[in-house]
Amino acid sequence: MAMRQCAIYGKGGIGKSTTTQNLVAALAEAGKKVMIVGCDPKADSTRLILHAKAQNTIMEMAAEAGTVEDLELEDVLKVGYGDVKCVESGGPEPGVGCAGRGVITAINFLEEEGAYEDDLDFVFYDVLGDVVCGGFAMPIRENKAQEIYIVVSGEMMAMYAANNISKGIVKYANSGGVRLAGLICNSRNTDREDELIIALAERLGTQMIHFIPRDNVVQRAEIRRMTCIEYDPAAKQSDEYRELAQKIISNEKLVIPTPVTMDELEELLMDFGILEEEDESVIGKTAAELEA
C-alpha cells in the first residue's frame, strides 16, 4: 500500500488533536504504520500517544542547537503507543515571527532526514485551527497532504471554518492532487447535528465520513494522557474511533469541494433552526430600544 498523507483541519478548539490521536491509535491497533506530524505551536498533537505533557518541537530544538541542520532525526522523532511515530513542528514564541514557518521547516527537515521512507501506511498532519495562512496551508499548498479531513460540529462557527477551509482546498486543488476526503463530526450535542452535517457535506460535494458522539470517557482518558483506545479498549467510544479508522482505510471519495456562499450557509442554518430568520428591523438596536 502506498503511503497516504492526510491533513486534519478544523476550527480551533473543535477537538482535532484528540480526534486525530484516537483515530491514529485505532489505525495502529489495526496494524497500520502511522506517523503524526503536529503542525501547531501548542505542540499538543502527540501527547496522548506519548503520555507526555508536550513533545519537544523541531523549532525549539533547532533554536537550542543553532540551526535545524544541527539536529538528528532521533532528536525530534519519538515513538509512542502502537509504534506510532510522533513529531511536533512547534513555532516561535507568542507574538514573534510566523508559526507557519515552523511547519515548513519541520516538513522539509523530515523529508531530508528520510522520516517518510520507513514504509509508512499513513502520515497525519494535525494543523492549527481554521487559519489558512500560507504556512499552515503548507501541507495543502506543497502537495504534501493529498487527503484533507475537516473536523466539524453542528455549531455555526465550526461550519463557517469548514467552508473556509474548503475554499483553501479549491485554491490549491487545481495545481496539485489535494482533495477533500470528508467531514468528521465531533459532536457537541447540538440539535439535529448529524442531519445538519450530512446536509453541509452534500453542499460541499463531500461526505460526513463519521459522526463521533460525545462521551466523557474521552476526557477521562485525556486526563491520563491516553487515547480511548488505550485507556478503555472495550468502551463504546473506542469502537467509534475504530469505525472511523476503517472508513478512512477504505475511503476513495476524494473531491474538489464546492464551497458555499455566506448566504447559502446561513440559509442552511435557518433550515435547521440554528439561525433565526433575519429581521432587518432589529439590526443595530440595543436591548433597551427593543423593549421600548
From Swiss-Prot:
Positions bearing ADP-ribosylarginine: 101
Keywords tagged on the record: 4Fe-4S, ADP-ribosylation, ATP-binding, Iron, Iron-sulfur, Metal-binding, Nitrogen fixation, Nucleotide-binding, Oxidoreductase
Pfam families registered for this protein in UniProt: Fer4_NifH
UniProt binding sites for ATP: 10-17
Cofactor(s) for this UniProt protein: [4Fe-4S] cluster
Enzyme Commission code: 1.18.6.1
Catalytic activity entry: N2 + 8 reduced [2Fe-2S]-[ferredoxin] + 16 ATP + 16 H2O = H2 + 8 oxidized [2Fe-2S]-[ferredoxin] + 2 NH4(+) + 16 ADP + 16 phosphate + 6 H(+)
InterPro entries: NifH/chlL_CS (IPR030655), NifH/frxC (IPR000392), Nitrogenase_Fe_NifH (IPR005977), P-loop_NTPase (IPR027417)
GO BP terms, alphabetized: nitrogen fixation
Source organism, top-level taxon: Bacteria
Membrane spanning residue stretches: none
Post-translational modification, as annotated: The reversible ADP-ribosylation of Arg-101 inactivates the nitrogenase reductase and regulates nitrogenase activity.
GO MF annotation: an example: nitrogenase activity
Entry binding sites for [4Fe-4S] cluster: 98, 133
HAMAP family in the record: NifH
Binding partners and assembly: Homodimer.
Recorded family membership: Belongs to the NifH/BchL/ChlL family.
Name used for this protein in its record: Nitrogenase iron protein
Naturally occurring in which organism (per UniProt): Teredinibacter turnerae (strain ATCC 39867 / T7901)
Gene this chain is encoded by: nifH
